Amino acid sequence: MSTFVNTDPTAFKGVWVFCEQREGKLMPTDFELISEGRKLADDLGVELCGLLLGDKVEGLAKELGGYGADRIIVCEHPLLKDYTTDAYTKVICDVVMEKKPEIMLIGATNIGRDLGPRCAATLHTGLTADCTHLDVDVEKYKAFLKTTSTMDVDNMKFDEGTHLKMTRPAFGGHLM
């Protein structure tokens, strides 16, 4: 069972973006996600944080900050130089369990399509794939947080819909 069961939902703060790099270069989806993440973070009044894994990638963090991220968490290790499912999943899930972001965006790249479901399964949380637009009903979301004292699904009551609304692309897209 998830570490987050019986955790106060207000303990989760911030919008995070997994920033993918290959051979020391940021991917175009990183900039799309930072832009979308900035809008969500502004709507919710929270920090936008990028999460960058690799080896000797500190310089890329400065570049991401210039695109609107408030903060970049950099996890560096020689074993993170190239993507491997197990290593990236372990590092990301450990950081997420410690820092507790409320939203995490992962690009729908080959790596993201492998990594996103594995992180969601490890963290016992949901995953919404193939989104091209994200919108949060801020008032309902805040009301939900005020009336819910636990992340235990059995205690959650939802009204007409969800608090995160999305649209699926007709012929592809790059956001997940």
Task: Give the positions of each predicted feature.
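N-terminal glycine-rich FAD/FM-binding segment characteristic of electron-transfer flavoproteins
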Residues: M1-M176
